[in-house]
């Protein structure tokens, strides 16, 4: 079937040749009908010989030319085709040389763009680290504020700024996340409590508490830094779209896998928005006046969860709230997945 495909392609590309040869032979036959002295037997012999030689020529040309395209079909690199001199005709060699030059030019552009991206990432990272210093100093000044109402309001805004900086830092590290991961058994409860502590200024202002119920062994095999980032983004969303309600945090065992469940009682997510919640920059269509959301939180979560082997399930009801379930992998599943990735890279 594959050979038939190449035959069809070849005949289509050589149809002008074939029509011209057929026209010449038909023309000779037509002339012989006019010239009665021309021997018919000789004419049929010439036409038959001509068509036979043409057929042989087309067959030889087909096998010679299609060989190069078979190499392309096997996804051979153009460098290999060039250096092994797999292009046989001058026209094929000219085509391969052109493609080779174009690939080299595009590779140079990709290298330049990658350097620019690396410089941009480094600049953003340095900026975030540099601005963390005055932000930390700001926190010390806020702690000295004696007016509790003003202090609480300042801490609320400080927490938002600090969270935005952390989010931006993680965004710049997305491309290198695989190199930045170290897996170990860590306490899920400890991670959750640490993240709650970071958001306490926001939750206090909004009148939100946390009901924690850890029913199963809460040690999971994960990267603590990136896992905390996921928990932080989910808690941030729960606080952002809730007010004067508690956030329920619990664990359960699903087929020997530890599952973390974070449930808020906020405004919920509409059905039409649900398929898009992980898109970069997407914000809810329910309230277009909402300006505090960047649409990056769940995008970050979705970008990292597969590297951590975490299954993510989101259910929501408008007016009743949203439930996010994180199902953590077993150690052998992570080791197996990392082995597969390592084998693919070689």
UniProtKB/Swiss-Prot annotation:
GO molecular function annotations of the record: ATP binding; phosphoprotein phosphatase activity; phosphorelay sensor kinase activity
Chief place of localization: membrane
Record GO cellular component, one term: plasma membrane
Topology in membrane: Multi-pass membrane protein
Reactions catalysed, as given in the entry: ATP + protein L-histidine = ADP + protein N-phospho-L-histidine
TM spans (from-to): 18-38, 43-63
EC number(s) stated in the UniProt entry for this protein: 2.7.13.3
Cellular compartment(s): Cell membrane
Alphabetical list of Pfam families matching this protein: HATPase_c (PF02518)
UniProt keywords, alphabetically: Antibiotic resistance, ATP-binding, Cell membrane, Kinase, Membrane, Nucleotide-binding, Transferase, Transmembrane, Transmembrane helix, Two-component regulatory system, Virulence
Domain Histidine kinase: start-end pairs: 126-332
InterPro entries according to UniProt: 2-comp_sensor_kinase, HATPase_C_sf, His_kinase_dom, HisK_dim/P_sf, Sig_transdc_His_kin-like_C
GO biological process, one term: cellular response to phosphate starvation
Subunit structure of this chain's protein: Interacts with GraX.
Function of the molecule: Member of the two-component regulatory system GraR/GraS involved in resistance against cationic antimicrobial peptides (CAMPs). Functions as a sensor protein kinase which phosphorylates GraR through the auxiliary protein GraX. In turn, GraR up-regulates many genes such as adhesins, exoproteins, transporters, toxins, and proteins involved in cell wall synthesis. Down-regulates the expression of many genes involved in RNA and amino acid synthesis or glycolysis.
The name this protein goes by in its record: Sensor protein kinase GraS
Biological source species: Staphylococcus aureus (strain MRSA252)
Gene name linked to the record: graS
């Amino acid at each position: 079937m594959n050979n038939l495909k190449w035959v069809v392609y070849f005949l289509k590309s050589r149809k002008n040749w074939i029509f011209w040869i057929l026209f010449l032979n038909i023309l000779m036959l037509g002339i012989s009908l006019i010239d009665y002295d021309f021997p018919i037997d000789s004419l049929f012999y010439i036409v038959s010989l001509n068509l036979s030689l043409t057929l042989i020529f087309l067959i030889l040309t087909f096998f010679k030319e299609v060989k190069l395209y078979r190499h392309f079909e096997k996804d051979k690199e153009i460098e290999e085709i060039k250096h092994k001199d797999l292009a046989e005709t001058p026209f094929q060699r000219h085509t391969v040389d052109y493609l080779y030059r174009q690939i080299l030019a595009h590779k140079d552009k990709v290298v330049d763009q990658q350097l620019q991206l690396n410089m941009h990432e480094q600049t953003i990272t340095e900026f975030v680290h540099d601005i963390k210093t005055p932000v930390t100093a700001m926190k010390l000044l806020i702690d000295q504020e004696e007016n509790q109402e003003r202090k609480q309001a300042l801490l609320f805004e400080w927490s938002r700024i600090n969270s935005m900086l952390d989010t931006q830092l993680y965004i710049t590290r997305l491309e290198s996340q695989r190199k930045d991961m170290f897996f170990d058994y860590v306490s899920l409860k400890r991670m959750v409590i640490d993240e709650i502590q970071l958001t306490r200024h926001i939750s206090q202002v909004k009148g939100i508490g946390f009901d924690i119920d850890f029913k199963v062994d809460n040690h999971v095999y994960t990267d603590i830094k990136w896992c905390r980032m996921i928990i932080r983004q989910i808690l941030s969303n729960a606080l952002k779209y809730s007010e004067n309600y508690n956030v329920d945090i619990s664990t359960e065992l699903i087929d020997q896998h530890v599952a973390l469940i974070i449930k808020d009682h906020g405004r919920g997510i509409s059905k039409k928005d649900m398929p898009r919640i992980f898109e970069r920059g997407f914000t809810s269509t329910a309230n277009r006046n909402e300006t505090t959301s960047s649409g990056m939180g769940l995008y970050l979560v979705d970008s990292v969860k597969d590297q951590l082997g975490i299954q993510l399930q989101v259910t929501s009801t408008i007016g009743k709230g949203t439930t996010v379930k994180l199902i953590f992998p077993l150690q052998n599943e992570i080791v197996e997945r990392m082995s597969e990735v390592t084998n693919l890279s070689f």
